[in-house]
Amino acid sequence: MATNFDATRLAVQTAFPTNDLLFDDKEMPSIHVFIPKFRLCDVLSTQSTETHPAFIVNGKEIDGFWFGKYQSTCTDSGRAYSLPAEDPTVSHNLDWFVTQTNAKGAGWHEISNAEWAAVALWCHKHGCEPKGNNNYGKDSSETYYEAIPVPGVQDNGKTARVRTGTGPLPWSHNGRMDGIWDMNGNVWEWCIGLRLVKGELQIIPNNNAADNSVSNGASSSAWRAIKASDGSLVAPDGNGTTTGTVKLNYTGGHWEWDTTISDSKDESRGALFKNTTAASSVGDAAKLILMSLALMPDTAMTGDGIDTTYGNDNFWANNAADERCPIRGGCWFSGGGAGVFSLNLNNPRSSSWTNGGGRSAFVKLPAEA
């Protein structure tokens, strides 16, 4: 470990026991938040005691994962870092962000959709879905709270990106200083391990994508489709037409998971996440996978503090194109549609924007345990 960071690490651990300074192959630090393992029944209405997929890597359970406390700032060394009060790096495609995180060493990776979903579901269950920079420097529901703007970065004279982690406490995932910041707005965040292929949902099983030796590439053999009848994972046919697998259909002004697509369009269409449904062709096991990956609401989850509107977050998608990869969270102009359940499956992996970035994560691979 780089000894000149010892005092800093001790200070971080003392103030926030769930936070730590993690060091990469260059002995450079990032601040990450530990998310301990939990079961599906801990965050969903199900009675299933199965471990959430974010805590299973290469067939083995892990104690938890380290989620970047801040959106990624990438340096000239070709590495992505999680640090406070920085300008989040933008304007790069998915594979570029994957390269930046993978270069840090074994266990480092761009955040996976499974990991993002685990944090989002925890927030939902505990009634603390975070606010953020979704309205030009502030949250659309707030009037006075603001974060520190990135100097020289504006959108038609208004605040665009803000410095990482400089917003008020409600902008952290748990409403505390030790939480994860900016999952609502600021910049969209690329996630790995999930995609649409001509509307067919494909995943890299569990959190295997966290092992950066497993390819997240377009032609990777790790991709699997989900059998709608029983939730089993099968090799896709490559055309998005695998028989009996879960696919994304658009019906009645909302998204619906089904085994067939009656309304397929190579364009971006949006709807509220809370209105996403599953057709009768999708069995309970497959629906549980969808809910665990924050791809549809758990309508049976009710009670004090539970926001059954899921923040009125938006779900955008293109269910006809060859490959569409996920970005999560929204950006500085997404308004009330931004949030931890905001999902955009409209973009190819080659896309880049000034409002699109990433976030790093780390797991201790089971073989190293």
Positions of PLM-derived features:
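C-terminal, surface-exposed recognition/capping segments
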Residues: 1-4, 150-160, 167, 174-177, ...
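Charged, compositionally biased non-catalytic regions
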Residues: 1-18
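Short low-complexity stretches enriched in small and charged residues
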Residues: 18-26, 140-144, 311-320
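Extracellular adhesion/carbohydrate-recognition regions
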Residues: 22-107, 198-265, 269-273, 324, ...
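Short aromatic-cysteine micro-motif
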Residues: 50-183, 187, 256, 263, ...
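Amphipathic alpha-helical scaffolding segments
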Residues: 117-118, 194-198
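Short secondary-structure boundary/capping segments
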Residues: 124-129, 195, 204-207
